[in-house]
Design a protein with these regions (language model features):
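N-terminal export signals
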Residues: 1-5, 9-30
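Surface loop/turn motifs at the tips and blade-to-blade linkers of beta-strand repeat domains
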Residues: 67-71, 111-115, 160-164, 217-221, ...
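Blade-loop segments of beta-propeller domains
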Residues: 70-99, 105-125
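Repeated scaffold domains used in trafficking and secretory/extracellular systems
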Residues: 73-79, 118-124, 166-172, 223-228, ...
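Residue-level detector of Asp-centered blade-edge/turn motifs that repeat once per structural unit
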Residues: 81-82, 127-128, 174-176, 231-232, ...
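Asp-box/WD-like beta-propeller blade repeats and closely related beta-sheet repeat scaffolds
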Residues: 116-122, 135-174
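Short, conserved, GDST-rich strand-edge loop motifs in beta-rich repeat architectures
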Residues: 135-138, 181-199, 239-249
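Beta-propeller blade signature
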Residues: 146-150, 198-208, 251-258
Length: 362
């Protein structure tokens, strides 16, 4: 339940939120003459120490341009395709999402969770930028909800979708405008799981009107589907958290194409063990799939054609992964930024940011 104290705390924190330039900040597009080094390309959440958190706008190499304080620890960021709005979502079970202008640094809106609701840390804009979809849950049951927020109405909640399962996490928009939802299947009290013996994870496809179009399940019900990406076409990549026996190491990645079945990506059990039962971020190019594990301090690259692991590399607190202009960018809680187009061809830079969880490409 949302209390007046919760609202006051979040609103008080929000009042102090103003973008702080880290480097000279160019708001013009590259076509207007701004150099790549000061043009916003990436946004992610960061830890600032002492219980302080921010959303950080960075250039194409992950070097910070500006940062915006946020009320509590953040998780995922949704980028509007038709404006310079970005929405940062609180880490689950989240109390808020905050919308800001990534060019000007202006805070647009702070949305606080509704009664018997919490946010799961992810959201996505519709292709026309008119709606924002957020993964939410009923706090007493973890029953999944997609909250629909109207941008033109100041991010007012105008609708809810449900009926696709318990514990949704990431939602992405497909090229046809439909939603793909990673449904973890886990009922939680706070962050404590309550139904591991009966969890029902799935990948669910939902229309913009809330109609359940398709739902596919992995054979192993202990694989909680968490994070998603798509390849620019109809293939969805799913990253899992394994909730089974601690000494078992199943595949944590799967692919699904409309009308087909899940296909697992392959690695040896000892290689999966490096990921410590958890995939954080996923990104895909035409040829490669990349996935990070902060718990395993590593990332892997798979061939999309063969579905075999072709590179496994160490990266301390490996977190965000995006595809930017045909090249992968990876972030790290230790501040490292890795640029990589294909296996074993990479460069690394050190940023001043303690990156936390995901990156989104503008």
């Amino acid at each position: 339940m949302v209390t007046d104290t919760t609202r006051r705390t979040l609103l008080k924190a929000a009042l102090g939120c103003a973008a702080v330039p880290v480097l000279p900040f160019g708001c013009a597009s590259r076509k207007d003459g701004a150099s790549a080094s000061n043009y916003p390309q990436l946004i992610g959440c960061a830890l600032n120490g002492r219980g302080q958190y921010s959303a950080v706008v960075a250039d194409e190499y992950g070097m910070p341009l500006s940062q915006l304080p946020i009320p509590d620890r953040g998780h995922g960021v949704a980028i509007c395709p038709t404006s310079s709005h970005a929405a940062v979502f609180a880490r689950r079970p989240g109390d808020y999402f905050m919308v800001f202008d990534y060019k000007s640094g202006e805070q647009i809106k702070l949305v606080v969770k509704g009664n018997n609701r919490h946010f799961y840390g992810h959201g996505v804009y519709s292709l026309d930028g008119k709606l924002l979809y957020a993964t939410e849950g009923k706090t007493d049951s973890s029953q999944g909800v997609i909250g629909v927020y109207d941008v033109a109405q100041g991010y007012r909640k105008v609708e809810e979708f449900s009926g696709f399962g318990i514990g949704p996490h990431e939602v992405i928009i497909m090229p046809d405008g439909n939603l793909a939802i990673g449904v973890g299947g886990v009922h939680t009290d706070g962050r404590t799981p309550k139904n591991l013996d009966s969890m029902q994870p799935s990948l669910s496809y939902v229309s913009p009107e809330g109609v359940l179009l398709d739902q596919v399940e992995l054979l192993d019900k202990k694989l909680s589907i968490r994070h998603l990406a798509h390849d620019g076409a109809e293939t969805v990549l799913c990253g899992q958290q394994y909730r089974g026996e601690p000494d078992e190491y199943p595949s944590l990645l799967a692919m699904h194409t409309k009308g087909g079945q899940f296909e697992s990506l392959n690695a040896e059990p000892e290689q999966w063990a490096r990921f410590n039962h958890y995939i954080a971020s996923i990104a895909a190019s035409d040829d490669w799939i990349i996935a990070t594990s902060p718990r395993g301090n590593c990332y892997g690259i798979w061939s999309k054609e063969t579905k075999e692991l072709v590179e496994l590399s160490a990266l301390s607190d490996a977190s965000g992964a995006v595809l930017l202009d045909g090249e992968f960018r990876l972030s790290s809680g230790a501040g490292s930024v890795v640029s990589q187009r294909k296996p074993y061809e990479k460069s690394s830079q050190q940023s001043s940011v303690q990156w936390d969880n995901h990156w989104s490409a503008i």
